[in-house]
Amino acid sequence: MENISDKIQKIRSEYGDKALVPEDLNSDPIQQFESWLADAIEVEASEPNAMAISTVDSENNPRSRYVLFKNIVNDSLVFHTHYESSKAKEINNNPNVSGIFFWPEIYRQIRFEGIASIADSKVSDEYFKSRPRGGQLSAWASHQSEEIEGREILEERIKELEKEFEGKEIPRPEFWGGYLID
């Protein structure tokens, strides 16, 4: 039986016809990003708005995870999270972040670095209102980066919240919102 190392070494892709042509690139990085993101969306890439974002913990260890990019505000990338999550705590301690979008379907990736800061509440409120009701309830129910005893605990919390907010607009929780990456 072939081991995983042998299998990995045999993986090959040809990129000759996918080369970047400098004349086709936009000198504005945000416009270039928007162009490639549009290309990824057009070919129905899997999760084209998923970005890996890296922070640094209190011991200066890098930590990466995927988040969903949701908007561009004044040339800043926007994502949303629980303000008590490990990523939020790390950003509050050291706002320098880096990340990458990878779209294998179009043979493109974009790497970025920047300073993360909490978005204006208007940005967070607008996005929260656009979320499906289930996503709004999940924001209230989930305490990111905290271990739970089982999925049934989370599901029970969502049922409680469904009753609490039945027939009402769900407000954005104060502990949840957006970050801008400049």
Residue spans of the language-model regions?
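Binding-site signature for planar aromatic cofactors or substrates
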Residues: 1-182
